[in-house]
Amino acid sequence: MAHVLMVTSNINMREPPETEESESEASDDAASDDDEEEAQPASNAYATLLQSFSTRHAGSEEHRKKRRKLDHEEVPQEDISEAEEASVYGTPEGDGTVVDQEQHETDDEAADEDDGKEQELEKAYEKHFANPDENELATRLKQIAANQWSSQKLTCGSGTTKGFGVLQIPVEEAQTPPKKLKSVHDIQLKQRLVENAQNKVGNFDQVEQTIAPSIFGYQDLLFGARTVQNACRLRDITCLHALNHILMTRDRVLKNNAKLAAAPDDVDAEYRDQGFTRPKILFLLETKQACVRVLDSITKLHEFEQQENKKRFLDSFSQPEDKFSEDRPADFRELFEGNDENEFRIGVKLTRKTLKLYSTFYNSDIIFASTLGLRRAIESGDPKKKDYDFLSSIEMVIMEQADATLMQNWEHAEYVFEHLNLQPKDAHGCDFSRVRSWYLDGHAPHIRQTIVLSAFVTPKINTLYNKHMRNVAGRLKYTADHTDGLIESLSYGIKQTFVRFDSPSHLTDPDARFKYFSSSILPSITRLPRTVDAGGLGVLIFIPSYLDFVRVRNSLVDSDFSYASISEYTDATDVRKARSHFMNGKHALLLYTGRAHHFHRYNIRGVKRVVFYGVPENPKFYDEVVGFVGKSIERAEISRQEASVRVCFSKWEKMELERIVGTKRVGKLVRERGDVFDFV
């Protein structure tokens, strides 16, 4: 039990540039399109936008009507040559690839499900995507522009699964709490998914019952309680939702194709059921192995007769998941076991019978990518001709491990979100008469559903939430319960002192922190007692930020301290040397960065005292680093009374502090007049 007493006042794990998104040839696409039918144009195009594109993308009204009738003649698909197939399935681009805008195969099941039950199943899809009420949409967009949300608090679970949610809807009046979904029986699923969903997902636990209405109701979700234990369930649930959305969209296009084919020439029928480009789902993942796990989830929820390029995919993306011993933390093994390369992007195309991997982006329904890999794809080629039009019609983003993305370069994530749902620079064979009005009006960022899963929430993730998760359907932020904090569960019996320094501004916080460290922490280290047989001072200085690490390291160059340093950029030989010299007492100090610990989880020996230059965002890092001291006590290298932990913090680290000291104490730490707080 811990008691508080107031005493006084960017690494990137890189590989050679990927080319998956451009490696598929038109002939490969033709092979999997043998049962597809194009979403044909209606008679009226969206004239205003068409003027912004080259005239090569426009066609005469007469030609468009004739094309609609000709393309719907019954032609045996197996007799279609590649050239004919290209003319049916899309307009060839300048690079020779074929772009098939929302061209989906004829699906008998679409007709089979066209009854009252199917209409009931599509209510959420209909309301949010297919046919939103224009007046309500305008009202909610106005509320979002004014940043006015009606909020309500949600609580669920108990014990270690207890959590809290804040549901925000862009309306003036408070909404009734959403009805919890108890199982997949309560979800609006396409019939093709029901059986597998019942077998693989089944009933929801208490936490899932709280977040499922937001997921399947097309609201944004920031889930800040992802764990190794619930990761697989969250993956299955989000993949089920993504598949359901693709099937809903495909069947809607097929039905409207049939209506257009049956309509007389003198009837100006209009069915707006598409976006500018085909890709609808974007999975932002941390490693290639995570991509394999998502694909496995998709294929167990939807059975495909054929999976094209599966062996090629597994050869490139999958590795055995047993390269670390059991003594490594579970979250570390989950993230880095298997293929941990983090520069990749790959398109996936779904037809009724086939899942095709390595489809070109413009022919894909789903894009799997890391933030780094996707940014590289956008920036490849001529800097003046960056291509991000394939992201213009993304309707669902699922970011699976945002906390791990933070440990890479978060700017890549910001870059990707800045390039979502922009008006395309080129037509890419788009039929504007089929494009939904809210796409044309530039409202897609507020219709897109964004699901972010993270082990915890940080200021950067909060910024993403506030800036890019502004859905007209609403948004839910869910966090784990930190009432007691991590410190309640620690049993090392070591004195842990939290010291607050004055930091007037968030912008000047790094300067204030360094000043406090130089004027208070370093002098206190020089006063530590030195004994002959102690094996050195054994002071580990944990520095979350690499920039702060460089600053501290440079300040020690001309000092009297003997020190070693380990960062994410330190090579293996120098790491071994630094650890050995620190353990043997040759170096009194060891500078250790947060990202070095994230990527390697070193078990460092010889640690007798710890100074946290800043509060770790990941509370597990605090536990593990304090545990270094605990192990030194067990080995009788230092007494419990001599061992110490000192944490430097400012009022700007409230979120990080809360996860460690608990919600019930964090207010005192950041607001009390005293600035030193001891925990035992």
Curated annotation (Swiss-Prot):
It is found in: Nucleus, Nucleolus. One of its GO terms (molecular function) is rRNA binding. One of its GO terms (biological process) is maturation of SSU-rRNA from tricistronic rRNA transcript (SSU-rRNA, 5.8S rRNA, LSU-rRNA). InterPro entries: P-loop_NTPase (IPR027417), UTP25 (IPR010678), UTP25_C (IPR053939), UTP25_NTPase-like (IPR053940). GO terms for cellular component: nucleolus; small-subunit processome. It comes from the Eukaryota. Residues 45-57 have a biased composition (Polar residues). Its main location: nucleus. The keyword Ion transport does not apply. Residues 18-39, 76-85, 105-117 have a biased composition (Acidic residues). Residues 1-120 are annotated as: Disordered. It holds the Pfam family UTP25_NTPase-like. The keyword Secreted does not apply. Component of the ribosomal small subunit (SSU) processome composed of at least 40 protein subunits and snoRNA U3. Belongs to the UTP25 family. DEAD-box RNA helicase-like protein required for pre-18S rRNA processing, specifically at sites A0, A1, and A2. This is U3 small nucleolar RNA-associated protein 25. It comes from Pyrenophora tritici-repentis (strain Pt-1C-BFP) (Wheat tan spot fungus). The gene is utp25.
